[in-house]
Design a protein with these regions (language model features):
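Active-site catalytic loop in hydrolytic enzyme cores
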Residues: 1-69, 82-95, 171
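Short beta-strand scaffold segments in enzyme catalytic cores
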Residues: 4-8, 40-41, 106, 125-128, ...
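Non-catalytic surface loops within mature trypsin-like serine protease
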Residues: 10, 130, 159-161
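Short Gly/Pro-enriched turn/cap motifs at secondary-structure boundaries
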Residues: 30-32, 117-118, 174-177
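CN hydrolase (nitrilase-like) catalytic-core segments centered on the catalytic cysteine
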Residues: 58-150
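A short C-terminal boundary segment appended to hydrolase-like catalytic domains
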Residues: 157-188
Length: 188
C-alpha cells in the first residue's frame, strides 16, 4: 500500500509519522494512494500537536478528536493545484482554529513541475491562524505568506493565550459543547 505521509521530526532526533486519512479521488486514480487508519496527537517539547494532511482538514471531527486530547497546535501541510482547492484548505483550517481553540499552521507547496502528471501546477499561501477573541488578531490571522510565492514565514505564538481563552473567552467552543446531546468518538 502507498500512503501520503507527514513526518514529525523532534529536536532530540526522534520522529513519528502521520498517514493522511482521506485520500482524494484524484490521488487514488493517479497514484493509487490508500488512506491511513490512525487519528492521533503528538507530544513535543513545545506543545501537544496534531497533523492533518491537506484534504483531512476538511473533516472537522478529526481536529475535534485531537482537541479533546489536548492539541494546542494543528499543522496542515498541503499541496493544491487550484485557488479553489487552496480556498477549501484555508477556510477549513481557519474554522478549525476557531472551533477547537487552537493555533493552526498551514504550509503549502508552490511552483510548477510541468513534466509530472497531477503535480504540474501548485497554488498555495501558507499561514498561521488563531481563534477569534480578544487576545488574538480580530480576523484570526496571525501571519500569512505572499500568495503563491516561495518564502519562509515566521510567527511567534503564545500558548498561554489558549489557556486564557479556555477560561475567560467571550465564547468557549470546547467547554460549551452540548455533550449531553451529541459526541464525536473514535472507532477503535
Amino acid at each position: 500500500l502507498l500512503y501520503n505521509v507527514g513526518f514529525l521530526c523532534r529536536r532530540d532526533g526522534t520522529y513519528e509519522m502521520y498517514e493522511k486519512l482521506h485520500v482524494t479521488p484524484d490521488e487514488m486514480k493517479c497514484w493509487g494512494l490508500s488512506g491511513g487508519k490512525t487519528i492521533r496527537t503528538f507530544e513535543t517539547d513545545c506543545a501537544k500537536i496534531g497533523v492533518l494532511i491537506c484534504y483531512d482538514v476538511e473533516f472537522p471531527d478529526l481536529s475535534r478528536i485531537m482537541a479533546s486530547e489536548g492539541m494546542q497546535i494543528l499543522f496542515v501541510p498541503f499541496l493544491t493545484d487550484t485557488q479553489n482547492a487552496y480556498s477549501r484548505v484555508q477556510v477549513c483550517a481557519h474554522a478549525r482554529a476557531i472551533e477547537n481553540e487552537c493555533f493552526v499552521v498551514i504550509a503549502g507547496s508552490v511552483g510548477n513541475l510541468p513534466k509530472e502528471h497531477n503535480m504540474d501546477i501548485q497554488y498555495a499561501r501558507s499561514g498561521v491562524f488563531t481563534p477569534c477573541d480578544f487576545a488574538f488578531p480580530t480576523d484570526g490571522r496571525r501571519a500569512e505568506a505572499t500568495p503563491n510565492t516561495e518564502m519562509i514565514l515566521n510567527s511567534d505564538i503564545n500558548l498561554n493565550l489558549l489557556n486564557e481563552l479556555h477560561t475567560y473567552g467571550s465564547v468557549r467552543n470546547l467547554k460549551d459543547r452540548r455533550s449531553d446531546l451529541y459526541e464525536v468518538r473514535v472507532k477503535r
